[in-house]
Curated annotation (Swiss-Prot):
InterPro entries per UniProt: Centrin_CML-like, EF-hand-dom_pair, EF_Hand_1_Ca_BS, EF_hand_dom
Protein known as: Calcium-binding allergen Bet v 3
Organism of this sequence: Betula pendula (European white birch)
PROSITE patterns (alphabetical): EF_HAND_1, EF_HAND_2
GO MF entries: calcium ion binding
Purpose: Could be involved in calcium metabolism in pollen. Binds 3 calcium ions.
Binding site for Ca(2+) 3: 181, 183, 185, 187, 192
Highest taxon in the source lineage: Eukaryota
Pfam families the UniProt entry points to: EF-hand_7 (PF13499)
Residue ranges of every copy of the EF-hand domain listed in the record: 36-71, 72-107, 130-165, 168-203
Keywords for the protein's UniProt record, in alphabetical order: Allergen, Calcium, Metal-binding, Repeat
């Protein structure tokens, strides 16, 4: 498949300058990595899912790969996505995305020999706008355990430290999470965090 998934987190939401195109045959990126656990795959999936509807379409995947500077054949990409797409769907759900990753040959994926956490940070920086990069810095402050999500307790603790009235009661914090929790998992990812903070700042202004 014409893409790179360890580098996949470079794509998704945000904007970046057009990178130099590289052919996959000469690429140092690989698409298969035993070290990519479900949590990291979820982050990649969420970055690719530009409209946050829980499905990665061919267009979203193509856009992500283009931001990575990877040349893709649209017909081949469509064929690959279709082979993992459930009947009646228009793209890949997260479980389909995991199946795609598991099916790939070990000769693909990841930066060889480099620190994966550093790679992940570099990828995000390369695709996020300055506003989003600033927001991500704030997100990391809230995400105290570094799992890529903000729990109600984490949110309450930081809001309290910042002096927001929302941090005074856990019930209010939980309502804030529910209001932006588009995938209903009871916690806040980066893109949900941006929406939540916008609403907090509007109410506080």
């Amino acid at each position: 498949m014409p893409c790179s998934t360890e580098a996949m987190e470079k794509a998704g939401h945000g904007h970046a300058s057009t990178p130099r195109k590289r052919s996959l045959s000469n690429s140092s990126f690989r698409l298969r990595s035993e070290s990519l656990n479900t949590l990291r795959l979820r982050r990649i999936f969420d970055l690719f899912d530009k409209n946050s509807d829980g499905i990665i379409t061919v267009d979203e995947l193509s856009r992500a790969l283009n931001l990575l500077g990877l040349e893709t054949d649209l017909s081949e990409l469509e064929s690959t996505v279709k082979s993992f797409t459930r009947e009646g769907n228009i793209g890949l759900q997260f479980e389909d995305f995991i199946s795609l990753h598991q099916s790939l040959n070990d000769s693909y994926f990841a930066y060889g020999g480099e620190d994966e956490d550093d790679n992940e940070e570099d990828m995000r920086k390369s695709i996020l706008s300055q506003e989003e990069a600033d927001s991500f810095g704030g997100f990391k402050v809230f995400d105290e355990d570094g799992d890529g999500y903000i729990s109600a307790r984490e949110l309450q603790m930081v809001l309290g430290k910042l002096g927001f009235s929302e941090g005074s009661e856990i019930d209010r914090v939980e309502k804030m999470i529910v209001s932006v929790d588009s995938n209903r998992d009871g916690r806040v990812d980066f893109f949900e965090f941006k929406d939540m903070m916008r609403s907090v700042l509007v109410r506080s202004s």
